[in-house]
Each structure stands twice: as C-alpha cells, then as structure tokens.
Amino acid sequence: MATLDAIREALPEPARDIKLNLQAVLQPGTLTPAQRWGVAVATAAAARNERLLAAVLADARAEVEPAVVEDALAAAAVMAMNNVYYRFRHMVGKASYAEKPARLRMNRLVKPAASKVDFELFALAVSAVNGCETCVRSHEQVVVAGGLSEDQVHEAVRIAAVLHAAAVSLELAGYAAVPSAAAAAG
C-alpha cells in the first residue's frame, strides 16, 4: 500500500480520522483480496478523484489479477449509469416509470471477467457511494444469495465510505492552507 500511504500523508489535519480509517479498512478481514481491492478500485473510480484512483489502482494491481481491476472499473462505469436511472425511478415513485423497460446495456453485469458475486459486490459498494437505494437493495440481495455474509457486505461498504471520504479529503487539502476570512481580516 505504498501509494495509498502517500495519499494518507497528503490528507489534511481535519481528515485525521480518514487517514487512520484508510489504513484500517484495507487490512485483511472477511473479504478476499480480490473483493477488498475490487471494492476499493470501484469506489475510488466512483469518487472521481484522479489522484486517489491512480493510487488505488497502483496498489491493487500489485495485489490482484487484472480481471479484478477490469471488473471493478466496469462496475463503476455501469453503476454510474444505473444509479442515476434507478434512483430517478425510485424518487419519482410513479408506477408508469417502473413499467418502462430500462433499455440500457448492462452486459458486463451478467458476464464479468472474473467473479459474478464479486462484480455484484463492487456494484453494491458503488451504489452505496452514489446513494441509490434500489441498487443497494438489489445488489445486497444478490451477493447474500451468492454466498457472501452480511459481515462481508458491511466490510465492503466501510471500504466504500472511507474511499469516498478520502476523495473528499484530498479536495479539502487544497483549502486547508487557505486562510479563513477572520484570519485574513485580522
């Protein structure tokens, strides 16, 4: 995790908790390395911070097969589309929209390069970051039915939460050095 260590060091003091959590959530736990790093890659991509994504990709590529990284990136891309679409349908709450076919291609969801259950876990984590209740519920059911435990789901969402917070914190790093209005006036 040498590259992520550099990210942790770049986080500003207000993100001290995120520094500590970033180190902790990527340690071995209930998830396999492929699951842990796939979730990290997918959620770093969903967080849209190039620096974080580059660091996570570098560390992940040293730990897992290329197919896992490819699936994680594909999950982030597919869920960027699906989370908007299904969140809209859920928020509007009209049966007429729910009856309309999505007509959105999602072939990778059906035929991932590596593990189907892992791909669904990556999609679940991205959906949590993107706030799509419908997708979170759907993917959670699939991964549990596929043999993952609630502890594994919980661990994946913890990783997603911390990676998202790290992306936000990296953005804050640029503002931490900016003097406040009160300090500038004084």
UniProtKB/Swiss-Prot annotation:
Known catalytic reactions: N(6)-[(R)-dihydrolipoyl]-L-lysyl-[lipoyl-carrier protein] + a hydroperoxide = N(6)-[(R)-lipoyl]-L-lysyl-[lipoyl-carrier protein] + an alcohol + H2O
Signal peptide bounds: none
Protein name according to UniProt: Alkyl hydroperoxide reductase AhpD
NCBIfam families assigned: ahpD_dom
EC number per UniProt: 1.11.1.28
Pfam family of the protein (one): CMD
Gene transcribed to yield this protein: ahpD
An example Gene Ontology biological process: cell redox homeostasis
A molecular-function term among this protein's GO annotations: disulfide oxidoreductase activity
Family of this protein: Belongs to the AhpD family.
Cystine crosslinks: C132-C135
Chain's role: Antioxidant protein with alkyl hydroperoxidase activity. Required for the reduction of the AhpC active site cysteine residues and for the regeneration of the AhpC enzyme activity.
Gene3D superfamilies: AhpD-like
Entry keyword NAD: no
Organism: Anaeromyxobacter sp. (strain K)
Top-level EC class as recorded in UniProt: oxidoreductase
Catalytic site positions: C132 (proton donor), C135 (cysteine sulfenic acid (-soh) intermediate)
UniProt keywords, alphabetically: Antioxidant, Disulfide bond, Oxidoreductase, Peroxidase, Redox-active center
